Amino acid sequence: MLKPMNLTCNGVHSLSPSTKRNVMKVLMFGWEFPPHILGGLGTASYGITKGLSLQPDVHITFCLPKPWGDEDKSFMNIIGMSETPVVWRDVDYDYVKQRLGDRMSPELYYQLRDNIYADFNYRLTDDLGCIEFSGRYPDNLQDEINNYSIVAGVIARQQEYDIIHAHDWLTYPAGIHAKNVSGKPLVIHVHATDFDRSRGNVNPTVYSIEKDGMDHADCIMCVSELTRRTVIEHYHQDPAKCIAMHNAVYPLSDEVKQMVAQRKPHTERKERVVTFLGRITMQKGPEYFVEAASLVLQRTRNVRFCMAGSGDMLNAMIEMAAQKGIADRFFFPGFMKGKQVYEVFRDSDVYVMPSVSEPFGISPLEAMQCG
């Protein structure tokens, strides 16, 4: 988890709840949240919201592209962009309740509807006047980012809040829109930059969105000092408004501890297991894992390799293992979440992280918890 702190960036330090108000209300924009996560962003979002919620003077409203209804709402409010109207629709209460289910109350729907832009017209809306979101990272991701920002304007007009917090580049335009609407300070949370994701082959569109978010931010939270230096040097930001806020993990539950303790001793294992766990993308260096596996298997066959995760390089890695004649020594279980992560670590002898750039990986911390 992330431990809460009083931010001291320009324009933000004056909002310390202990000195100005009884409760600090945070409007937070995110892209994923447990149990429906696609990577570390969802895990980190849970950690910071859960940690902040432990403070009696912090109240959080968390915005998601597409909630599924089974998210933990016990410690904060969740607003779905896919349930927020941007175009007026004359619909009755019972129909709204039936359509939205547990994802949003009809009362909130009508309150949000009262704050749409009167002159706004958007043809890609449903019968409730809402825009559809995939809740993932689709091929038309840029369209979803733009639509997310449109919806953020409605939410920013309706909600009461003291500060805006935007997670990663996907939500920076939304954070900027909310700041322009409200005049409230904007904190952006840099979980990674495109310099990390692209091995230096930066996408100019992504870079532009990232820099725009940083330029408009009153405070820039970076997950490591490495990321902070990248933000300062490559995005030309004022060091005074950039702080390092490291990720962390929660202690293992008793249930997971018992599961991890069931690990077989080395003497009872016929083969050693070496594991890669993470997004199978350029940033994480999965091809180096396969290359290293090939070298190891030239010396011994008493090893199996697990590449757990999903990503745009998964098929290429499966093909690479086959081309090197080591496919019989490889296991590709797909994306792991929840207890599955700890089951993989429990059954592993070595965890390898061949990332080309790693702002602050959560998986290594989870691996360390398993001994």
Residue ranges and their predicted role:
Residues 226, 248:
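Carbohydrate-associated surface elements
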Residues 21, 58-156:
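A conserved catalytic-core segment of Leloir-type glycosyltransferases
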Residues 361-364:
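Short glycine/serine-rich donor-binding loops of glycosyltransferases
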Residues 356:
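Aromatic "clamp/platform" in nucleotide-sugar-dependent glycosyltransferases that forms part
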Residues 316-336:
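Nucleotide-activated donor-binding/catalytic signature segment of Leloir-type glycosyltransferases, i.e.
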Residues 266-293:
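Conserved donor-binding/catalytic core segment of Leloir-type glycosyltransferases
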Residues 335-336, 343-348:
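Short alpha-helical donor nucleotide-sugar binding micro-motif in glycosyltransferases
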